[in-house]
Amino acid sequence: MSAPEEMTLKVIAHIRTAFPTKFGIPRQSGLVDSLRGEVIFTPEYRNADAVRGLEDFSHIWLVWQFSGAVRDSWSPTVRPPRLGGNTRVGVFATRSPFRPNPLGLSSVQLETIEHRPDVGPVLIVRGADLMDGTPIYDLKPYIPYADCHPDAAAGFTAQTQFHHLTMVCDAGLWARVPADQQAALQGVLENDPRPSYQHDPERVYGMEFGGLEVHFKVDGEVLTVTGIDRR
């Protein structure tokens, strides 16, 4: 019997993160380990038996949908931001959301599993690169002996440069950030949340993070926070 050309996937969970919009989300999972997220199962899958033994793993894979970048069609080539936004590469040589099946794959740290009476087991994760409310279709344990490839070739990503910025912020302004969010927000800002092709030192950028509206400018390797307001 031949396999069907299409299949239906069920959303098993949604993730809660500090990012209500796409802007500012780290470009890959694991870049900001202090970012906290909660994976909350949909009612059908709120079964403690389904996660039995998962607590013995330190990391998990999340299979999710690019729900913030849904298109009716796909493109065989895309322009990765890390290449300046002008060079085209085959979509299957990238992690672009504009693919035939808009699925993402992220490796995150599993900090703990909380069992809550209202929503069942909740996975507390660190280092996710997902927007708040992103639907998750599957999760699997990360298995080091099979999933880790230290000698793997990195393709065009080996040629790109990650900009690690120095963050500068007035102490009084920074005090507006709750203490339990400061490390995560600093990590996001130091990883340069700007689009890779934008380098105007006079431009003021704004991003939403954990109920805050954060504004900043970047000049060279220094990011200066210019405003933090509660939304």
Predicted feature residues:
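Arg/Lys-rich, positively charged N-terminal/basic patches that mediate binding to nucleic acids
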Residues: 1-48, 54-56, 142-188, 196-197, ...
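Short acidic, Gly/Pro-enriched loop/turn segments at secondary-structure junctions
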Residues: 114-127, 148-154
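Short coil-to-beta-strand transition motifs
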Residues: 4-11, 98-108, 210
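Active-site-adjacent substructure of cysteine-protease-like catalytic cores
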Residues: 50-104, 197-199
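Enriched for short, Lys/Arg-rich terminal
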Residues: 219-231
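Short, conserved beta-turn/loop elements at beta-strand boundaries and strand-helix junctions
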Residues: 20, 113-120, 130, 221
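Residues located in well-ordered beta-strands
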Residues: 14, 106-111, 124, 135
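Short solvent-exposed strand/turn elements
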Residues: 118-142, 230-231
